[in-house]
Amino acid sequence: MFPSLFRLVVFSKRYIFRSSQRLYTSLKQEQSRMSKIMEDLRSDYVPLIASIDVGTTSSRCILFNRWGQDVSKHQIEYSTSASKGKIGVSGLRRPSTAPARETPNAGDIKTSGKPIFSAEGYAIQETKFLKIEELDLDFHNEPTLKFPKPGWVECHPQKLLVNVVQCLASSLLSLQTINSERVANGLPPYKVICMGIANMRETTILWSRRTGKPIVNYGIVWNDTRTIKIVRDKWQNTSVDRQLQLRQKTGLPLLSTYFSCSKLRWFLDNEPLCTKAYEENDLMFGTVDTWLIYQLTKQKAFVSDVTNASRTGFMNLSTLKYDNELLEFWGIDKNLIHMPEIVSSSQYYGDFGIPDWIMEKLHDSPKTVLRDLVKRNLPIQGCLGDQSASMVGQLAYKPGAAKCTYGTGCFLLYNTGTKKLISQHGALTTLAFWFPHLQEYGGQKPELSKPHFALEGSVAVAGAVVQWLRDNLRLIDKSEDVGPIASTVPDSGGVVFVPAFSGLFAPYWDPDARATIMGMSQFTTASHIARAAVEGVCFQARAILKAMSSDAFGEGSKDRDFLEEISDVTYEKSPLSVLAVDGGMSRSNEVMQIQADILGPCVKVRRSPTAECTALGAAIAANMAFKDVNERPLWKDLHDVKKWVFYNGMEKNEQISPEAHPNLKIFRSESDDAERRKHWKYWEVAVERSKGWLKDIEGEHEQVLENFQ
């Protein structure tokens, strides 16, 4: 009796203590929230930052507040197959000759009879804040994204720009309505203070210095593979020593169709108009960031931030300048082409403006709000490539921190701080971010103001394998079903799925590999295959993270300071290690638990409280461009960002209530060590057997390579 009574007393005390803790935490959070509200009431306005995010399959504008919440937003999903339709979205005029059609009901959005899906395979429904792109006769009914040949991916430069303006106009119109309600209730209105940009990298656009318009009506997108012959010919005629020398300069394996260098060479070799403009010194080269900033600034700023410039294959990582040897390697005469100035990720680029040809297409309402913005000289002052922006938005600032974005593919970045590490294990070296105005403030190190580097690894197929299960095998009805179905079985039943539909990327780098499903038996079910598909993505993320850690403790072991910086966060060295995740597949608790189980107990998987990490990263970059910390509209420094975005205004050592950020979730491994190692061994064997598949197809190798991907 007495032991039971004793346990009851202990339990009651613990319950009361924990309840008191929760109450205290809740009161502190409410106090912090009310303090900020009172501060806002004493202000003439509440500051916001506009973030433009141009992705491979969609564009969006989000107006962020201090908590990293979207006060107003608008998104346009690109169409690739529609043939005609109205352009009423966000205020663009529809040409009188364009046939109009009624907008379908939400849930039944279709283009040419086919459902529309996001890059991660999720069904898209048109809402007030999200529109499906329809086509404009002014652009000959061409969509933003085109696939003219197998392996070819093109974007329409002017339509990219129009989509951005549409999204911004719609966000501002929504903000007008919100502000009217706030003023009526005695609250100060919101006000946009500055703008940042995040964009898909490597995509190459060429335009005329004289007219400011594209030389040809398409840009070559990052995942286009038309340059494979150029790349292979280059490397067959380049010594191994020279290849290593170029790798040291760029951090990139230039034996790849990814980077801008081979795309520029293709334009000059295959497009007479581009060749003519080049010979006449009228050719301007840029990636998407350069194109947008040039067109959207009154000053026609011709710049590229370091995170984008580092993906061209022309920039020297040591100098952060264009390198003559790299330009000469690709046969580019620097005197005949205009290259953008390489700048930091966080500085004033120019004042917001809109080209006249776009302004003429607008209806009165969007035209008015945009003109008001133009009159205010709103500064554009933050820019990051999408993966770097995601890293910043995940607050992965410390050396050794890692983030993984699960989209169509999977991109993992590992922060190496101010140290440039050239990978010996299949990863790329790239710029993470450069915020030059971050000075020592609030105990932060002054090194934060220096350029930061990262190791990067990419998985070719992530969300795309879920689409394949849905559309090709019809194992699932919706992409959201893959997690629950995979979790109906405790493991894959011996099945290993290597999703190498377009070869293997980091750390294997084998374009000749192809997808394989191994280990099936009569015991195998649809659930086993679904789980094996998810595990195939997660195993590749583990392989990349292990490769990056090997680099950090290999080359980095020569530098004691570097080891001390990463010792508390690096993979397989400390239980404090965290992999920050975002993107479509990260929404699934089941998928993220599988990822945590595969990584093991040394790595926690942390899902961000904000769904828009990439756009948030661009907003942070714009905020930090103000040199005076007291002029920064939302956050004084990076610690302040974490305080408000992750801890709801509380200090990080105070406990945060899960209710404050329901999407902030930590996944920890629940797997058995022996089982985890056994499944990893199965994976390694399966990968080896999937490699070189195309090489073994006699007489077909060269033709298949031409259509690779």
From Swiss-Prot:
Q: Which GO terms describe its molecular function?
A: ATP binding; glycerol kinase activity
Alphabetized, the UniProt keywords read:
ATP-binding, Glycerol metabolism, Kinase, Nucleotide-binding, Transferase
GO BP annotation list: glycerol catabolic process; glycerol metabolic process; glycerol-3-phosphate biosynthetic process; triglyceride metabolic process
- Reaction catalysed by this chain? glycerol + ATP = sn-glycerol 3-phosphate + ADP + H(+)
Which domain of life does the protein's organism represent? Eukaryota
The UniProt entry's GO CC annotations, sorted and at most eight, read: cytoplasm; mitochondrion
The UniProt annotation places substrate binding at T56, R201, Y258, D386
Q: In which pathway does it act?
A: Polyol metabolism; glycerol degradation via glycerol kinase pathway; sn-glycerol 3-phosphate from glycerol: step 1/1
Record-listed ATP binding positions = R60, T408, G463, G584, M585, S586, R587, S588
Report the protein's function: Key enzyme in the regulation of glycerol uptake and metabolism. Catalyzes the phosphorylation of glycerol to yield sn-glycerol 3-phosphate.
Family recorded in the similarity comment: Belongs to the FGGY kinase family.
Q: What is this protein called?
A: Glycerol kinase
Name of encoding gene: GUT1
